[in-house]
Amino acid sequence: MSTTADKIAVLGAGSWGTALASLLARHGHPTVLWGRDAAMVEAIDQRHENPRYLPGIPLPDSLRATTDLASAVEGAAWILVVTPSHAFGETVRALAPLRPAGAGVAWATKGFEPGSGRFLHEVAREVLGEDVPLAVVTGPSFAKEVTQGLPTAITVHGDVPEFAQTVAEAMHGPAFRAYTGDDMVGAELGGAMKNVLAVATGVADGMQLGLNARAGLITRGLNEMLRLAAAIGAKPETLMGLAGLGDLVLTCTGDLSRNRRLGLALGRGQTLQDAVREIGQVVESVQTADEVMRQARRHGIDLPISDRVRAVLHGEQTPEEGLRALLAREQKPEYPDTLFK
């Protein structure tokens, strides 16, 4: 297949996929957004609005949308996957035989592969082969604010520096700063764990435990990120940057976060089912909490906050019981001596 100058295919027409497709189109790149919902795709393509996920926010006239995956990726210079983590593997497998020769694949999906707990770059590499450039787009970014043109900073980590740079340059603009790195493991870990930790801070705020508790949970949550990162060979500086600390702070404090809103609802006494129904979109933490703890057990790392979130989400503990379990833990040094060595 031929490759059109810099056509970009974005797979996934949810809020984040639509926001990134809109950003790329506004930056002058021929951009096609693929989605499964025919009515929503038609609204994006013809009326330039995503009425379900980003109602009332105009999208660029140049942004095209389709339900035909082959048409979406044909001639693309590179492809950006922005689906929920549970649909990531399925989407990449459908993409594999259609991908134009030489087209790299990036994703802005956050989470692990359900069931196996594998990192998404491991899934992509297995499906796409060894020669396809890969990159992950992550960092503190709410879709609504990006489509409104509010200042945002993200980071792109890839296994081929030139491809990560290509993705970053396409996204970089007056109100959108895109940095680059080469630590895909750390970038993916931060993007997944922050969703689980946002539930914890949401629960605390829902229970009206105060700002001290919120700050403590965010900081000790970062500690959990750093310890698991060290165990799996990620770079600590990745977790101290946009992919870790930045995304953690945003998701734990901003009410646009679905995971924080889930925690708020649980802290106020709602059931998980009612809270998820009320939010009306995929809440990644419900699944990711299991996969985070699978990684922790695999590497022998104690993650008390993440584990309490998992227990609450599974109905094994109430939020009050989870809080008591955390507060009953023994006194210890703030950081292990070996963490930054």
Swiss-Prot record:
Query: Looking at the record's lineage, which domain of life comes first?
Result: Bacteria
A GO CC term attached to the entry: cytosol
Copy the pathway line from the protein's UniProt record. Answer: Membrane lipid metabolism; glycerophospholipid metabolism
Q: Which reaction does it catalyse?
A: sn-glycerol 3-phosphate + NAD(+) = dihydroxyacetone phosphate + NADH + H(+); sn-glycerol 3-phosphate + NADP(+) = dihydroxyacetone phosphate + NADPH + H(+)
Major location category of this protein = cytoplasm
Q: Which InterPro entries does the entry link to?
A: 6-PGluconate_DH-like_C_sf, 6PGD_dom2, G3P_DH_NAD-dep, G3P_DH_NAD-dep_C, G3P_DH_NAD-dep_N, NAD(P)-bd_dom_sf
**Where is this protein localized, as stated in its record?**
Cytoplasm
- Tell me which residues bind sn-glycerol 3-phosphate: 110, 139, 141, 194, 247, 257-259
Q: Which UniProt keywords apply?
A: Cytoplasm, Lipid biosynthesis, Lipid metabolism, NAD, NADP, Nucleotide-binding, Oxidoreductase, Phospholipid biosynthesis, Phospholipid metabolism
The UniProt record lists the EC number as 1.1.1.94
Please, one GO biological process term?
glycerophospholipid biosynthetic process
- For the ligand (NADPH), the binding residues are 15-16, 36, 110, 143, 258, 282, 284
Per UniProt, what is one GO molecular function of this protein? NAD binding
- Pfam families according to UniProt: NAD_Gly3P_dh_C, NAD_Gly3P_dh_N
Q: Which residues are catalytic?
A: 194
* UniProt similarity note: Belongs to the NAD-dependent glycerol-3-phosphate dehydrogenase family.
| Function noted in UniProt | Catalyzes the reduction of the glycolytic intermediate dihydroxyacetone phosphate (DHAP) to sn-glycerol 3-phosphate (G3P), the key precursor for phospholipid synthesis.
Question: PANTHER family this protein is in?
Answer: GLYCEROL-3-PHOSPHATE DEHYDROGENASE, GLYCEROL-3-PHOSPHATE DEHYDROGENASE [NAD(+)] 2, CHLOROPLASTIC
Which NCBIfam families does the entry mention?
Answer: PRK00094.1-2, PRK00094.1-4
Protein name per its UniProtKB record: Glycerol-3-phosphate dehydrogenase [NAD(P)+]
- What species does this protein belong to? Stenotrophomonas maltophilia (strain R551-3)
